[in-house]
């Protein structure tokens, strides 16, 4: 009878002891994943551009204010500013001699990037 109790205690110890080391290993893996987490990249169209307040807020939420400032992205007081490397202007409606540049309209927020024909 005493031998059976000893064997039962021995097997119980074998079952319970590894749980602590397994828990530590899982915590280490979670910390490793947290350290390896990378920030998303800023889309190339925005680097060095002047953007409206809504686009600025989106970029800050995406990558953070420090990364936005490091990418030389400037915030305009409104969506009415230059676009396409100073070759166009953000407007709500383009003039007759202009066309809407859909590629650069992303930096204009709710406006369109209007460029001369």
UniProtKB/Swiss-Prot annotation:
It comes from Tachypleus tridentatus (Japanese horseshoe crab). Residues 1-23 form the signal peptide. It is found in: Secreted. Transmembrane segments: none annotated. This is Big defensin. Significantly inhibits the growth of Gram-negative and Gram-positive bacteria and fungi in vitro. GO terms for cellular component: extracellular region. Residues 26-36 form a propeptide. Disulfide bonds join 83-113, 90-108, 94-114. It comes from the Eukaryota. The lineage of its organism: Eukaryota, Metazoa, Ecdysozoa, Arthropoda, Chelicerata. One of its GO terms (biological process) is defense response to fungus. Interacts with intracellular coagulation inhibitor 1/LICI-1. Expressed in all tissues examined, including hemocytes, heart, hepatopancreas, stomach, intestine and skeletal muscle. Belongs to the big defensin family.
């Amino acid at each position: 009878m005493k031998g059976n109790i000893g064997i039962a205690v021995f097997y119980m110890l074998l079952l319970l002891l590894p749980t602590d080391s397994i828990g530590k290993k899982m915590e280490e893996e979670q910390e490793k994943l947290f350290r390896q987490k990378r920030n998303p990249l800023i889309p190339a169209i925005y680097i060095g551009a002047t953007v409206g307040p809504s686009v600025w807020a989106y970029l800050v939420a995406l990558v953070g204010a420090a990364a936005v400032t490091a990418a030389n992205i400037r915030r305009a007081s409104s969506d009415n500013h230059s676009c396409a490397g100073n070759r166009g202007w953000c407007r709500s409606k383009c003039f007759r001699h202009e066309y809407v540049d859909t590629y650069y309209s992303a930096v204009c927020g709710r406006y369109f990037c209007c460029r001369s024909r």
